[in-house]
Amino acid sequence: MADLSGIKPTAMTEYAHSPGLAFRSLVIGLTAFLTVVDLFATQAILPSLTRHYGVTPAAMGFAVNASTFGMAAASLVVGFFSPRIDRRTGILLSLALLAVPTSLLAVAPNLAVFTALRVAQGLCMASAFALTLAYLGEQCSAMDAGGAFAAYITGNVASNLVGRLISAALADGLGLAWNFYFFAALNLAGAALVYFTVDRVRPMHAMMPAASPLAATLAHWRNPQLRAAFGIGFCILFAFIGTFTYVNFVLVRPPLSLGMMDLGLVYFVFLPSVVTTLLAGKVAARLGTRPTIWGALTVAGLGLPLMLAPRLREVLAGMVLVGVGTFFAQAAATGFVGQAAADNRGIASGIYLACYFCGGLVGTAVLGRLFDAFGWQACIFGVGAALAAAALLTFALKR
């Protein structure tokens, strides 16, 4: 049994590596996988859901990604009260409750109910996500923190790949309803994993006098480096959502004309990201956060023109580059927030995640309108603008 609480607090082991880190990193990544597997898996069946509810791609894309609204709201609330929340209990309850809206999606009668259930999913996912990031920031040594955050983001990346493959296969073979029942079972598996691997640990900042949550929130926003990191997170998911939501409709239309199972297999494009994201912590530690993020954003930007090609090979190559670049940048930015916040890291993580997921919601709405009105090229232009904005914000981070 991997006891994650065995990772010593930063204040106690400032420069030491924690023993058994490799196995704990595996558990951390698996926890991340089971926490957010619902978030993007549904994108693999977007065309089928669009036909099922008889709506436009933009409307269905917004409904599926409404989970990001719940995630933004929950990230703020959980971050606000983070110093008073027991990490283990909060993560455990969030994952157990997540199974409820996930299973109800199987019987959602209309788009409004579907959207509301996706928001509820987001509330539960973000609560677990924010508390886990706060836990890692508090319990990892300075040397181990980058690797722990990278492992968590890698689990997130893996959930994008495996979740979409499973979703496409289940929907194709058993229908839409069984797809959601299966993911509800995965949510319960995540709760079980936390129950057996995470011991009860008091939030570090509950052990000492601390500023009020509002004062801590304002202090974080006054920090120009953290403020820039929050903006970078917004831009990253804006770009990611815009790319991987609406590319599904491009892939199933002529000249590519992929079927549902083929569409699921396309998401093997995330496989390189599973490997590269693990390196983000080491690269940022060696080169610095700014060069790391700039390099990652450049890689993502190089993929955009390829995705406009009429041939599947070029489109897939573009998807690989965008996936590798955005996930690498996200891992570097997430680790930066965890280390740049001198105190109240739970609140800082909550603000970052709220901005990150708000970027996803805004990206869905804005880029969906562009896609419906002007087509795929306009959508790609919007993605490029978001990546450029993130690159500019990176100038404000410390060297």
Where are these regions (language model features)?
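Juxtamembrane intracellular "pre-TM" segments in multi-pass secondary transporters
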Residues: 10-18, 199-230
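Helix-loop-helix hairpin linking two adjacent transmembrane segments in secondary transporters
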Residues: 142-144, 151-198
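Cytoplasmic helix-loop-helix junction between adjacent transmembrane helices
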Residues: 117-156
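Conserved MFS/SLC helix-loop-helix module at the cytosolic interface between two early adjacent transmembrane helices
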Residues: 73-109
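Helix-breaking motifs and short loop linkers at transmembrane-helix boundaries and internal kinks
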Residues: 54, 86, 107-112, 141, ...
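Helix-to-loop junctions at the C-terminal end of transmembrane segments
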Residues: 75-86, 276-288, 371-372
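C-terminal transmembrane helical hairpin of 12-TM major facilitator-type secondary transporters
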Residues: 290-333
